[in-house]
Amino acid sequence: MKALRRSTCLRRPLAIIAVVVVAIIVVAGVFGFRAYSDAQYNNAVAACATASENVRNATNDYNNLVNGDASEAAALIKKDVKDASTLDALNKELSVELPVYEGCVADDTAGFKSATAKLNEQADWYKAYTQSLQKAVDAVNASKK
């Protein structure tokens, strides 16, 4: 009977220790996951803000060209240039439909990542069309009489 009581007394503290260790591991896992999730969210928000700034800069470059050199070149008429097709190409470049700015409006990490991807596409669009518009402006200016 003493042996039975002794083994029961030894098992009970071991069981309590095991439960406490498991509880500590679970709590640490939950806090670790939350910290990881928060870090991912913060990184996504920061990336979206950077992408938004890139779109703003690319849009400004495009608008400066449209309102500056492209506007002056578009004011020319066919009599003012040697090759009238350069004016047609310029007008075609000026009539493109601009992308709609969506911004960083999201509630979760996936939403911010999606918004970042869209903003990066918009920045690329503005950069590409700024270059093609500049080429069209240069062609009109080279064709001036």
Regions found by a protein language model. Name each.
Residues 1-145:
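Amphipathic alpha-helical assembly segments used for oligomerization, scaffolding, or translocation
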